[in-house]
Amino acid sequence: MDLFAQNNLSCLLTPSLRKRYHILIKDHLNVAPKLAQGVKAISHHQSAWANTQAAWRFLDNDSVGYVQLNLPLMQAARQELAASESSYGLVAHDWCRNNYLGHDCKLDRIQMSHDKDVGYELFASLLLNANTGQPLAPLGLDLKAKQGTFRCRDMEPQEPMPHLEQLVDRIEWQESLPLQKTLIHIIDREADSAPHLRQLTGVKWLTRGKKNTSVKYDNEFISLEKLAAKVKSEVKGVVDFKGKEAYLFVGEAEVVLQRKSERGLVNAPTVRFVVSTLCNEKGEQLAQWFLLSNVADVDALTLATWYYWRWSIESWFKVLKGHGFQIEHWQQETAPRIFRRLIVSSMACVLTWKLYNDNSPEAEKLKPFLIKLSGRLTKRSKPITHPALLAGLWVFLQLTEVLNNYSNEEIEMYKSVMSSYFGQSV
């Protein structure tokens, strides 16, 4: 039984491509160094060269459609969301630039900002558990290149769109999905655009506002920074901020989503303004967020907590770029190949997150065992981390492969040879 059947996920690829997809996902359950970021070979029945060639053929195969590759991710998202106890699902949206400055063989790179910032731009949406903030599955992937924007829901590249139009289009698509729970779309300050937010009719959103952004409060236009000084905040608890304890203060007010430059606008919607402030024990301000949201049926502390959890997508980008997969060092030479491998890597993340979020007695025993195998030193306050789980999973998969393919006599012989070099403890 492959991992798709094991997890009740559909895969519409042909049997041979489905088998290779399964193998590639397992091959990506590891933490790769920069200089060895290629597809690893877990099977002892196949040489590394043969495995690399098979991976190349898969990633370069036009029959491997993005929609087909993404189907298991979408089904995993529905399953994990349905299993959560909350009536909400959080969707964090963000962009991530992947720089390939030294990859001259990638002829379809684009300039993303300055002349040395060339590569492919990823736009991703990450589904989070509304009770815990833990990641569940990607709920949309776009990769922008010279040919256009490759999307996990389209067979061909699409015409590129400005960021906010791309965001609105993504949200409208997600709202059409049969997820059966209310989605809360969480976006950073880039989404602080009143016209675009007003465009999201019937959609629940939460965004961070810029300090100089103006809203209408008590029939007057005022910046969020000045309004925050007027709002009475109350301490709501102690949270972790950059490894240290901080006091969380939360206050809120009702405002009209209308800018000072839009004085002639009528029927602008009323939204909530939430100011979230972190202070140390001396009362010194460590951080402050000005939040705007049209979610009415949760308290201000919940909104502040939900925005705090938006950081999960940043953590995922770190896994993709540095702490796990080294995407900026991948040697595939075209955006379609990079995009296919990105979807494969995302599926590996989904399985790792599923294990991380599993609180069953069996999973609670397995996770510390995998951390031990990883050789990682983790914080006492957070003994289990996603990168450490990935590293431990790879060692465990290699162990099971050894036990399945070598006899006890062979293993004892190898131990004896090793002991002659490294001592009897081997």
Show the residue positions of the predicted features.
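Single, function-defining residue in the core of a domain
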Residues: 1-106, 114-121, 126-426
